[in-house]
């Protein structure tokens, strides 16, 4: 693992003070962290990545991995908010995969479950264009029982459809007074994710958890989540989440031909054996 700390050249005293720690961006600040034992580090560094440049010299939309440890693929994640999508146009631009929102739970006290209205058309269009498909479920579960309910609802919505990629549990905090999930702690959130993923796997699909850096460091207990796939939201030109992950969401506001609205962009990492 390459050393990301500022201690190089700062003397033995400084190094001893932070022995066994790594210097990371937690999404808020640069901080020292003692890594969990038994969780592999990503080993990725800034020099492993390069953003494409447009003909006019401006930044392109694609970020490429230059290293040799992984093969990478380029993808989008979309929901009904993106409207009508020309999937063939996305394929022509090099999109390899898409994560489609399958359904969601509402923010308010009732917390009703809903399908994504565009899922069926997106699924058909993406597969017809030769784009591999995975899905995510937007969770607002406030209990383990509700996470189980969401998993069973997701399986009902999938109705046996073939997927190329995992079903991801996408729990996100909602900062408003009537949010039903304001008090979800680390233990509860981790238990919810594990329950959701276990039921999805029992249904015959791969499962994973979507999270940002703050959640990965402070809200989920990654040491108890086994080999569950991780999808990390870490916007920028290179990923600096310390632990190993499977998918990197690097842009929340890209423009691509074939999509009228802005779209999220992702890189999938496939280890080279």
Q: Model-derived features: where do they sit?
A:
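Hydrophobic anchor at the start of a short beta-strand
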Residues: 133, 206-208, 230
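Functionally critical loop-and-helix segments that line ligand-binding/catalytic clefts
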Residues: 15-75, 82, 223-273
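Accessory recognition modules or surfaces
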Residues: 165-172, 216-233
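Substrate-binding cleft of extracellular glycoside hydrolase catalytic domains
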Residues: 68, 72-193, 201-203
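Short beta-strand/turn micro-motifs composed of small residues
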Residues: 137, 211, 234
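Single conserved hydrophobic/aromatic residue that forms the stacking wall/gate
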Residues: 1-14
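Aromatic-lined carbohydrate-recognition surfaces of secreted/lumenal glycan-active proteins
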Residues: 204-218
């Amino acid at each position: 693992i390459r050393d990301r700390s500022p201690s190089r050249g700062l003397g033995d005293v400084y190094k001893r003070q932070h022995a066994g720690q790594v210097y990371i961006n937690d999404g808020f600040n640069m901080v020292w962290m003692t890594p969990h034992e038994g969780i592999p580090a990503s080993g990725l560094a800034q020099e492993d990545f390069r953003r494409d440049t447009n003909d006019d010299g401006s930044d392109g939309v694609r970020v490429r991995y230059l290293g040799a440890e992984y093969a990478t693929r380029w993808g989008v994640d979309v929901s009904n908010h993106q409207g009508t999508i020309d999937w063939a146009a996305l394929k022509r631009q090099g999109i390899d995969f898409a994560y489609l929102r399958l359904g969601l739970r509402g923010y308010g006290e009732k917390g009703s479950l809903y399908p994504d209205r565009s899922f069926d058309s997106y699924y058909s269009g993406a597969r017809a264009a030769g784009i591999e498909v995975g899905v995510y479920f937007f969770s607002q579960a406030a209990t383990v029982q509700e996470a189980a309910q969401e998993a069973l609802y997701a399986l009902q919505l999938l109705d046996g459809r073939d997927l190329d990629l995992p079903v991801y549990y996408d729990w996100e905090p909602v900062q408003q007074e009537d949010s039903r999930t304001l008090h979800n702690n680390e233990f509860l959130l981790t238990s919810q994710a594990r329950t959701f993923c276990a039921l999805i796997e029992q249904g015959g699909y791969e499962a994973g958890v979507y999270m940002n850096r703050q959640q990965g460091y402070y809200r989920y207990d990654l040491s108890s989540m086994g080999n569950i796939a991780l999808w990390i939201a870490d916007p920028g030109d290179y990923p600096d989440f310390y632990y190993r992950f499977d998918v990197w969401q690097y842009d929340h506001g890209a423009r691509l031909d074939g999509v009228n609205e802005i779209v999220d962009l992702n890189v999938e990492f496939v280890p080279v054996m």
